[in-house]
């Protein structure tokens, strides 16, 4: 799976894009917005969801059952999330509150458990004094992605019908269009409802590409599709949902097209630090920015080095052990 693609490197780059983008926001500056479309971090999330949809759908096809498939997904998400949640609230949060004994009166245990179950409890009571409130704002995408796993598991691992992804993709396209004109801003499971359809679209676009790979995985087809999408995006710039939807599809298709065209000289399946970088970056950056008071770029560099070290520990001490336990051959799907 790793010899002729660069999915692992792409995920690591996307995780670092989130770190860089968030560093602006956490420092009280506007995040860099690219092409009037999304922040750098937002584009990174699209990359994550596209790759996840592509790889996870293939994992579902190979799985023996829905339970087998979801067990694999749980082993990928929760083992690393548990220590991260504990460190976030019992160490990083405590540091951010000057090691105050009163800090632990703010339902820290409940907040930690909520984080482990991907349902973040309100944390304004422990972070309102920071430049940008929030203890780990990146985790909002996890329940969203896990719901995509469940839908994928039902559609493929249980029904064994890859064609279901076309229907699911069309549903998410429709929901994205409806959400773009709706004034509903309700929140469910800590997620603003309007954020889900477009991210889900990226996931299931990647999944659909995986199911019909033979029809597009040719250099001429890839170049033609990317060129047409890019031209249409340019022509529709400033036209609201028309431009946004085109850009989501363009980023999703381009991500999969590039990753399946380029080899991986860096990672080659040896490790996957991207998840660790993603879940540890936000709280580490909060600590560095709000306690060390360094310059913008030095604090970004220190955050990146610290996060890469923590992700290295997370991979080698936790994640890899649970992934190899499921199979004699390491799988990063």
UniProtKB/Swiss-Prot annotation:
Q: Name one Pfam family in it.
A: Acyl_transf_3
**In which domain of life is the source organism classified?**
Viruses
Give the UniProt entry's GO cellular component terms: host cell plasma membrane; membrane
Q: What is its EC number?
A: 2.3.1.-
**Bilayer topology term:** Peripheral membrane protein
Q: Which UniProt keywords apply?
A: Acyltransferase, Host cell inner membrane, Host cell membrane, Host membrane, Membrane, Transferase
Q: What is its main location?
A: host cell
Q: Where in the cell is it found?
A: Host cell inner membrane
Q: Which GO terms describe its molecular function?
A: acyltransferase activity, transferring groups other than amino-acyl groups
Q: Which GO terms describe its biological process?
A: polysaccharide biosynthetic process
Role description: Antigenically converts S.flexneri serotype X to 3a, Y to 3b, 1a to 1b and 4a to 4b by O-acetylating the O-antigenic polysaccharide chain.
Family, similarity comment: Belongs to the acyltransferase 3 family.
* Name this polypeptide is given: O-acetyl transferase
Q: Which organism is it from?
A: Shigella phage Sf6 (Shigella flexneri bacteriophage VI)
Q: What is the lineage of its organism?
A: Viruses, Duplodnaviria, Heunggongvirae, Uroviricota, Caudoviricetes
């Amino acid at each position: 799976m790793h010899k002729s693609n660069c999915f692992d490197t792409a995920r690591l780059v996307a995780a670092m894009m989130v770190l860089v983008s968030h560093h602006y926001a956490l420092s009280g500056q506007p995040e860099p917005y690219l092409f009037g479309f999304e922040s750098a971090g937002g584009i990174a999330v699209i990359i994550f969801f596209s790759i996840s949809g592509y790889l996870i759908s293939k994992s579902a096809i190979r799985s023996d059952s829905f339970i087998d498939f979801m067990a694999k997904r749980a082993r990928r998400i929760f083992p690393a999330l548990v220590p991260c949640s504990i460190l976030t609230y019992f160490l990083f949060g405590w540091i951010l509150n000057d090691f105050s004994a009163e800090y632990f009166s703010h339902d820290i245990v409940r907040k930690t458990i909520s984080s482990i179950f991907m349902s973040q409890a309100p944390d304004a009571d422990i972070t309102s004094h920071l430049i940008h409130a929030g203890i780990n704002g990146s985790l909002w995408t996890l329940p969203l992605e896990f719901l995509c796993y469940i839908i994928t598991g039902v559609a493929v691992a249980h029904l064994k019908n890859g064609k279901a992804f076309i229907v699911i993709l069309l549903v998410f396209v429709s929901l994205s269009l409806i959400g773009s004109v709706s004034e509903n801003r309700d929140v469910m499971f800590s997620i603003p409802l309007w954020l889900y359809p477009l991210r889900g679209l990226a996931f299931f676009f990647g999944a659909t590409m995986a199911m019909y790979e033979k029809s597009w995985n040719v250099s001429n087809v890839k170049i033609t599709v990317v060129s047409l999408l890019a031209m249409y995006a340019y022509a529709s710039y400033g036209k609201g949902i028309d431009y946004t939807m085109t850009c989501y599809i363009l980023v999703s298709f381009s991500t999969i097209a590039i990753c399946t065209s380029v080899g991986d000289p860096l990672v080659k399946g040896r490790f996957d630090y991207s998840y660790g970088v993603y879940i540890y970056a936000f709280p580490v950056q909060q600590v560095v920015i709000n306690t060390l008071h360094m310059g913008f770029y030095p604090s970004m560099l220190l955050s990146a080095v610290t996060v890469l070290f923590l992700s290295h520990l997370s991979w080698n001490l936790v994640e890899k052990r649970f992934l190899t336990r499921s199979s004699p051959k390491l799988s990063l799907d």
